[in-house]
């Protein structure tokens, strides 16, 4: 590719200028990173449950005295460390004393405790054995906004007489965000040293390893900065940073390996620095450009899921891949032009080039001598690794994604296991009419709908909410099944089959979002996969000038992706290594 060779010579002659511009770009990325952005949990909007949820927000009146701003809530579970009953006056006094600082905080809208509500409602706020009680706390701001100050509120609740656990939407979401950030930092702290050691083995030179790793670092900075810049103009998922870090480091090191290795080979063959850079970019650089295109194509498949968090993941991934290609063709060759032969400095004495060549040459020779047995054995192993993929079960994330030792997870387990009704799940049914839902005819239709829903399997009760909107009536349905169980999903589907005279039935709630999200993904996945395969074949055909090789590449990708998903199912869903890795087996 002659343009890349010419570009390599330009970079060599203007290496300090190219390096300066690259560093300015890194500085801009750092500035964008420091400016931050609002990363959030992006919902599925274009689904029945999403439309029903929006309809409720638009139509239902705000309760009297409720704030005009959005609110969210969490619960505090109290247990006496002196074995007092939750109805004991000393227990109640200690609980209220611990809650007084919350009541005085301007960010807290309300605090509901068992002693402040009617006896029938209070029973639901005490555990089955009567030893624990919970307080429901409503705060200003949505779940994401409240998560910013939740830690400060939690620190206000202290007591020497009662033990306290916080759980609910706000602390669970806060802990998920915190866990993601901690995992991101841990991944960086672990992956960078491991990558450096592997590069030392590959290059046998500390200088070449540091150059390659340095490109990975600046690519990650650029990717995170680009993601935060994207977040200032559109919704970006909180998981985007994980994608940027993992893909950015891997791709940047991969591309740098290509160029640095080819550059050193040309120097070893007697080329001067300028020619070595030109040849490296014309060969390895060409492969990098097409590799970046194919990786971006794969990530672009996520754009076929509009209205979901996957779009932002695809955009963030594409940004970091583009930055990887950009720095591999600018920042890296500028460094190589400055270092020249010194890129091989600080050589390790125990990593000689001949032995490494003999190792890989020997492996390749053995494979070529017995291609059919090696192929059959490899495919058989991959098929075995992929076999658990056939039992894949999809579900939305819930509290079980958190480590069991976290307070919000422990509180969730106590809440579900010890408080009446908390082990059940709810379904919200919206009956929408063209006019007043309180008219005589519509009242009768809603009551008929309630009766039919109450008779469905796995329904413990179905009630008509006293609150209605200009065009909607609301029913609340309780089921003894957990939100992500097959029975709860079947119930959502069964309710959606129930008609209401003169109107339309919409179902929302956690289980409905789960059902709709999975269905949404399954409907669009074939189109996304078809797009990725077709465009990848086209890109590889233009690169290789072959029809067979692109098809082989697609087949290898299918096998490797299937094996990867098989490993995920085997570990995460089936629970192998759960004790070692400290997680709860769950759907993916």
Please give the residue ranges for each predicted region.
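Structured non-transmembrane domains adjacent to transmembrane bundles in polytopic membrane proteins
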Residues: 45-71, 80-173, 391-580
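Acidic beta-strand-to-loop metal/phosphate-binding motif
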Residues: 74
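Membrane-embedded transmembrane helical bundles of large multi-pass transporters/channels
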Residues: 1-37, 108, 123, 128, ...
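Disorder-to-helix initiation segments
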Residues: 41-42, 49, 246
């Amino acid at each position: 590719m002659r343009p890349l060779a010419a570009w390599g010579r330009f970079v060599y002659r203007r290496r300090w200028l190219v390096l300066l511009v690259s560093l300015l770009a890194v500085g801009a990325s750092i500035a964008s990173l420091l400016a931050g952005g609002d990363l959030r949990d992006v919902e599925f909007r274009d689904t029945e449950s999403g439309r029903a949820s929006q309809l409720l927000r638009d139509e239902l009146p705000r309760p009297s005295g409720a704030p005009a701003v959005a609110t969210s809530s969490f619960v505090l579970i109290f247990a006496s460390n002196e074995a007092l009953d939750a109805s004991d006056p000393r227990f109640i006094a200690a609980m209220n004393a611990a809650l007084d600082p919350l009541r005085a905080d301007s960010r807290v809208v309300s605090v509901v405790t068992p002693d402040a509500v009617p006896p029938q409602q209070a029973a639901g706020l005490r555990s089955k054995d009567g030893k624990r009680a919970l307080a429901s706390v409503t705060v200003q701001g949505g779940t994401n906004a409240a998560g910013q100050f939740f830690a400060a509120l939690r620190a206000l609740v202290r007591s020497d007489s009662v033990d306290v656990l916080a759980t609910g939407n706000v602390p669970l979401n806060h802990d998920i965000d915190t866990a993601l950030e901690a995992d991101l930092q841990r991944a960086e702290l672990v992956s960078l040293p491991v990558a450096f050691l592997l590069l030392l083995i590959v290059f046998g030179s500390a200088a070449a390893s540091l150059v390659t790793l340095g490109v990975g670092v600046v690519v990650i900075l650029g990717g995170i900065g680009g993601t935060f810049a994207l977040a200032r103009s559109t919704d970006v998922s909180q998981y985007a940073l994980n994608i940027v870090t993992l893909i950015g480091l891997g791709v940047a090191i991969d591309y740098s390996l290509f160029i640095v290795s080819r550059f050193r080979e040309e120097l070893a063959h007697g080329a001067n620095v300028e020619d070595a850079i030109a040849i490296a970019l014309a060969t390895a650089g060409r492969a990098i450009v097409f590799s970046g295109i194919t990786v971006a194509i794969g990530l672009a498949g996520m754009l076929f899921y509009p209205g979901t968090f996957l779009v932002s993941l695809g955009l963030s991934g594409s940004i970091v891949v583009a930055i990887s290609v950009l720095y591999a063709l600018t920042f890296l060759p500028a460094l190589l032009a400055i270092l020249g032969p010194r890129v091989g400095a600080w050589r390790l004495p125990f990593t000689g080039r001949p032995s490494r060549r003999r190792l890989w040459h020997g492996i390749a020779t053995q494979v070529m001598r017995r291609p059919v047995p090696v192929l059959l054995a490899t495919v058989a192993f991959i098929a075995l690794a992929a076999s658990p993929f056939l039992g894949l079960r999809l579900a939305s994330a819930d509290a079980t994604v958190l480590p069991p030792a976290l307070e919000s997870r422990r509180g969730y387990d106590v809440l579900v296991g010890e408080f009446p009704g908390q082990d059940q799940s709810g379904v919200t049914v919206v009956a929408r009419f063209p006019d007043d839902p309180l008219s005589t005819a519509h009242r009768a239709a809603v009551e008929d709908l309630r009766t039919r829903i109450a008779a469905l399997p796995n329904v413990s009760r179905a009630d008509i909410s006293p609150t209605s909107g200009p065009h909607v009536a609301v029913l609340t349905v309780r089921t003894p099944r957990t939100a992500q169980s097959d029975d709860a999903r079947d119930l959502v589907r069964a309710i959606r089959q129930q008609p209401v005279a003169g109107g339309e039935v919409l179902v929302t709630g956690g289980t409905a979002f789960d059902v709709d999200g999975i269905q949404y993904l399954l409907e669009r996945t074939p189109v996304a996969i078809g797009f990725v395969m077709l465009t990848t074949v086209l890109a590889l055909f233009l690169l290789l000038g072959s029809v067979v090789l692109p098809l082989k590449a697609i087949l290898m990708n299918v096998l490797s992706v299937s094996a990867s998903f098989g490993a995920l199912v085997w570990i995460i869903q089936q629970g192998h290594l759960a004790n070692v890795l400290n997680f709860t087996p769950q759907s993916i």
